[in-house]
From Swiss-Prot:
Family that this chain belongs to: Belongs to the IPP transferase family.
Enzyme class: transferase
Natural source organism: Nostoc punctiforme (strain ATCC 29133 / PCC 73102)
Residue sites binding ATP per the record: 9-16
InterPro entries: Dimethylallyltransferase, IPT, P-loop_NTPase
GO molecular function, a single term: ATP binding
Keyword Coiled coil found: no
Protein name: tRNA dimethylallyltransferase
EC number: 2.5.1.75
Catalytic activity annotation: adenosine(37) in tRNA + dimethylallyl diphosphate = N(6)-dimethylallyladenosine(37) in tRNA + diphosphate
One Pfam family matching this protein: IPPT
Chain positions covered by the region annotation Interaction with substrate tRNA: 34-37
Cofactors, names only: Mg(2+)
């Protein structure tokens, strides 16, 4: 019987290292739930598991897309559900900090299968967010009530789905939860300690060659590549352009990562099914191992 263990939480809480240790004990595999680790060549800045780590335990949904491709939540859900159904190992580990990816699996979100429409998006974006939101209120008032008036990304997506399918996105959404047992484990620590973790990790990324990685990606794909405008890459890109110093790029990365971690914590805390553990507890691995044994034994006996 399939069982799934989710390891989630904010960035820099140690999810990957914990998952690796657990997977080795369990003889299991790791399915990534990180929206940037799916892209090839984006390695250091995404804290992607190293080649050596990936040799220790099979990792899935890492390095599956070119940086010029687009991986939607619907794509991720489809591939992950197929993996869970086909991999002959249990329990499986789903690990990452991309909340929508995790939610798409554990809650079985129904997601409209509408690929990004570049020309349509361009036409809509030219109208401005104020007009777009007014249009959404007319064609899909239910979705408009759930989307903030300044949320241009979700407004655009809702209109895109409506104009492609002729049906409001609110009527195409819902949930179809999986029928297998799921244990959701969250890692967290206090703000000051998380800030120190983020600082140390940022410094390590730079020491590991983040500047050279960004320089290579800019040369190969062009500085306008959308992924290069994401956390950790956009700041180094500013440094390479001569706009800021490397120290300033580092401090900006730390600041932006802390802000991102705050948003992640808010997202995950909204889900009561997640069982929280202190990432700085020296007995963390043993405590979670005990909880996993309870989970696997309970679901096996039932």
């Amino acid at each position: 019987m399939t069982k799934l263990i989710v390891i989630c939480g904010a960035t820099a809480t140690g999810k990957s290292s914990l998952a690796l240790a657990l997977a080795m004990r369990l003889g299991s595999v790791i399915i990534s739930a990180d929206s940037r680790q799916v892209y090839r060549k984006f390695d250091i800045g995404t804290a992607k598991p190293t080649v050596a780590e990936q040799k220790l335990v099979p990792h899935y949904l890492i390095d599956i897309c070119d940086p010029t491709d687009t991986m939607t939540v619907a794509d991720y859900q489809e591939q992950t559900q197929a993996l869970i159904a086909s991999v002959d190992v249990t329990p499986l580990l789903l690990v990452g900090g991309t909340g929508l990816y995790i939610r798409s699996i554990v809650q079985g979100m129904k997601i409209p299968r509408v690929a990004p429409q570049i020309e349509l998006r361009s036409q809509l974006e030219s109208l401005g967010q104020l007009q777009l939101y007014a249009m959404l209120q007319q064609v899909d008032p239910v979705a408009a009530q759930k989307i903030h008036a300044n949320d241009s990304v979700r407004t655009l997506r809702a209109l895109e789905v409506y104009y492609v399918t002729g049906c409001p996105i609110s009527e195409q959404q819902g949930e179809n939860p999986p029928n297998y047992p799921i244990l959701q484990i969250g890692l967290d620590c206090d703000v000051e300690k998380l800030g120190n973790r983020i600082k140390q990790r940022t410094e390590q990324m730079i020491a590991d060659g983040l500047v050279a990685e960004v320089e290579y990606l800019c040369q190969k794909y062009g500085a306008d590549l959308s992924l290069l405008n994401t956390l950790g890459y956009q700041e180094i890109k500013q440094y390479l352009a001569g706009d800021i110093s490397l120290d300033e790029a580092k401090e900006l990365t730390i600041l932006h990562t802390r802000q991102f971690a705050k948003r992640q914590r808010t997202w995950f805390r909204a889900y009561p099914q997640i069982e929280w553990f202190d990432a700085n507890n020296p007995d963390l691995l043993d405590k979670i191992w005990l909880r996993i044994n309870e989970f696997t034994n309970c679901t096996h006996s039932s």
